[in-house]
Amino acid sequence: MRNSLKGFLCSMAAVCLTILAAVSCTHVDDTLGQDFIPGGNDKLSLHIDTLGLGEGEAITASQVFYDSIGLAGSTRHTRGAMNLHIAYMGRSSDPTFGKITAASIATCLPSEPVRPYFYRGRHSTFDSVKLSLNMKLVSGDPSVRQRFNVYRLRDTLAYTTDTIYYQSFRYEDHIESEPAFSFEYSGTPADIEEIKLDVLPAGEAFLKEMMAADTTLFYSDRYYEYLRQFKGFAIVPDTSTPENAALYVNYLPNTYLNLYYQRDRDDWEIKVDDENKEREITAYMQLAFTDNDTRDNTSIASIRRDYSGTPYAALNEGQRIEAEGVAYVQGIGGMATVLTFPDSFFESLEARKPSSDYTIYINQAQLFVWVPEHTATAYDRAFQMLGSYSNYGKMSIIADYYISDSETTSVEVPYDGKLNRNPGKGYYRMDISSFLQHALLNDDDESRSLTLGGTYTPYEPFSDYFTSLMVAGSERPVQVRVVYTLIKPNGEQ
């Protein structure tokens, strides 16, 4: 009779456990793998076992910091870190995790077409500028006053199919040598902030150029021509800004640059205005930072971290740092955690085969990683979802075994990477079935290493989340549960 064995095993990073429940692998589909048995009189048997590692061996963890993070895999964005609808700016620091500096680079387009009569009756050039921001505090000390400079872009920020965010991107190579505007800011933002900018000599030249431009350049069908002349801005912390200031996030759909000037109204305008009969008024032209109306705006988040002077200083040089007991996953382009499976893990799995001509098929492999602190505060600070990635540089997310079922039926997906917030629980459960199957067939270090990184919503691509994870050396290290099928080739006895 053709024979197939189905097994269930569990591996802890440091010790072997025997507290396994069969229901945990059979409540969704207790015939998992049966389609691989080519006959009508076949026997399917279930075994529950514990997978032991070699003495002193464990699923190890290390901290890494990647220069490039592609977001398409985790957010389904078509443009990755470009056009995120949010921007970061400011500086903050942490004694353990170092310094972070953020700048916002974006194109700006007229929020509405400027008609030929727009400047009629004016008797001044643009004489003042306001920046309207929709900010909230991310981290740091908001009482520390910061100075920001607003530079004109020297090069065009064109649309691109590149979905990678590069921490090494140097906006300094693409901006004018002198800032056009500057402003100071401190405090906790209250929704919309309107900030009057200091107009610098380069800013005066920009305003004159805007006023002298042919108004037809501002029509929607000429926006590409407009962007060739007025390429956009970079909002950058001044070098005088203290490192221990604050980091802010800004929502670009509510961000505008208003250029003000004085004009005299016609008689008919005064007549229809019941509230204001003054002839001289202040008017403005508004530039928008978003692509709300698909006007081809482009934005880039520039986020830089510096771990100098911290236990993680080696990350600056691209090195890995072994984690003992606790590992971390940071938001806002910070560090990730790499789990490396030892060879003995796969050797023990291979040893389950009755003979060498059997094949192991991974039906389901679940990764469990616990957080050390089970409090509402820790849960709120942590990522509400972690992703398991086979290549974090490109973020090739590992497919969920049940993802097709979850999209077509009411079956609850056993892996979604979400944090279990129940009291005393506090763990992430992730499906690593495809990773483990690939690792069985490939014994190189890259194939047997898995990166845990954050996942994000479309409006929080670099959120200020921070997750602590218990790893090898802790009281409850990483655990893997595997459901597998043993298949004998050719249906032989």
Regions found by a protein language model. Give the residues of each.
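Secreted, disulfide-rich extracellular signaling modules
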Residues: R2-V15, I19-Q493
